[in-house]
Amino acid sequence: MVLVHVGYLVLPVFGSVRNRGAPFQRSQHPHATSCRHFHLGPPQPQQLAPDFPLAHPVQSQPGLSAHMAPAHQHSGALHQSLTPLPTLQFQDVTGPSFLPQALHQQYLLQQQLLEAQHRRLVSHPRRSQERVSVHPHRLHPSFDFGQLQTPQPRYLAEGTDWDLSVDAGLSPAQFQVRPIPQHYQHYLATPRMHHFPRNSSSTQMVVHEIRNYPYPQLHFLALQGLNPSRHTSAVRESYEELLQLEDRLGNVTRGAVQNTIERFTFPHKYKKRRPQDGKGKKDEGEESDTDEKCTICLSMLEDGEDVRRLPCMHLFHQLCVDQWLAMSKKCPICRVDIETQLGADS
């Protein structure tokens, strides 16, 4: 007796090795309930090559015939010899281990997400009141959700995890996993701040996506909203706060008023000093030791000009030094306050 694997069934074949590929017929046992027995007919005299390889066991889904299940058999003789098997309905088999591979992966992912949701709700019970349900089909206008045959994730009203539960009424054909569009996979990957889009619709979807992660920092960013206009509003609010602060403090200036300038300085008409006798006259255009210059405008002082002498004995044009003292009460050369210098001398 030789065991031949046909799909998920192990069928015994009586006879020699050379006759194990002979066609046979089977019929379902009339009294079969949980176990399924099959009657094998007598072997036929048809001969096959002795090196005929056995079919490897493969997993098949309900609804497929036995001659279609092992898709990688190495000879066409077995396909011709086997008669089509009747469709078997395994309605008494339940549990996630018998589901298709893609559905089983979704079941495991659902378990992980539910555990993370439970831990987050236990540690932060007040967050459930701040969350609003979101419809995934409104997140991105260009995404066609009809292309996916997998169960669509639904956003929980009291949590932040995707609900990957499977409806019982769906047929097995709807569980085929198809590749997700590339622009949607970008948002399912690890979020990076410099990859966030700037348009409002994409930004809203990113905000909803990062809520799936249990990190408190990402949840805080999701609550903040990541609104593109938030940066401009923050700048506008900061500027308005500065204006309000200026109104409360008034005009803060470090300069002196005109009365203080007139009180602590000495304005007069400039009179140029003459050179002493016995010293040779210098050529016209050359500066002498007696020439004085205003260090603010860098112009030479001429006779009859209005000048102002500070308590530190530095001399400037009146117009130049008045504008300076209106902004700062310190001398432009020695940086001494005009009021402090006067008090020290007196």
UniProtKB/Swiss-Prot annotation:
Zinc finger boundaries on the chain: RING-type: 294-335
Q: Which family does it belong to?
A: Belongs to the Arkadia family.
Q: Which domain of life is it from?
A: Eukaryota
Supply the InterPro entries for this chain. MBR1/2-like, Znf_RING, Znf_RING-CH, Znf_RING/FYVE/PHD
Query: Annotated region Ubiquitin binding: where?
Result: 266-268, 309-313
**What does the entry note on its domains?**
The RING-type zinc finger mediates the E3 ubiquitin-protein ligase activity and binds directly to free ubiquitin. Non-covalent ubiquitin-binding stabilizes the ubiquitin-conjugating enzyme E2 (donor ubiquitin) in the 'closed' conformation and stimulates ubiquitin transfer.
Give the main EC class: transferase
Map out region (Disordered) in residue numbers.
23-76, 267-288
Bias kind Basic and acidic residues: ranges: 275-284
**Molecular function terms in GO for this entry?**
ubiquitin protein ligase activity; zinc ion binding
Protein name per its UniProtKB record = E3 ubiquitin-protein ligase ARK2C
Report the EC code(s) recorded for this entry: 2.3.2.27
Q: Which UniProt keywords apply?
A: Metal-binding, Nucleus, Transferase, Ubl conjugation pathway, Zinc, Zinc-finger
Its assembly, as annotated, is: Monomer; binding to the ubiquitin-conjugating enzyme E2 does not trigger homodimerization.
Q: How is its activity regulated?
A: Binds free ubiquitin non-covalently via its RING-type zinc finger. Ubiquitin-binding leads to enhance the E3 ubiquitin-protein ligase activity by stabilizing the ubiquitin-conjugating enzyme E2 (donor ubiquitin) in the 'closed' conformation and activating ubiquitin transfer.
User: Gene name, please?
Assistant: ARK2C
- Catalytic activity entry: S-ubiquitinyl-[E2 ubiquitin-conjugating enzyme]-L-cysteine + [acceptor protein]-L-lysine = [E2 ubiquitin-conjugating enzyme]-L-cysteine + N(6)-ubiquitinyl-[acceptor protein]-L-lysine
Positions that bind Zn(2+):
C294, C297, H317, C320
Briefly state the protein's biological role.
E3 ubiquitin-protein ligase that acts as a regulator of motor axon elongation. Required for efficient motor axon extension in the dorsal forelimb by enhancing the transcriptional responses of the SMAD1/SMAD5/SMAD8 effectors, which are activated downstream of BMP. Acts by mediating ubiquitination and degradation of SMAD inhibitors such as SMAD6, SMAD7, SKI and SNON isoform of SKIL.
User: CDD domains annotated for this entry?
Assistant: RING-H2_RNF165
Specify the species. Answer: Homo sapiens (Human)
Q: Can you say where in the cell this protein is located?
A: Nucleus
Entry annotated with the keyword Zinc-finger: yes
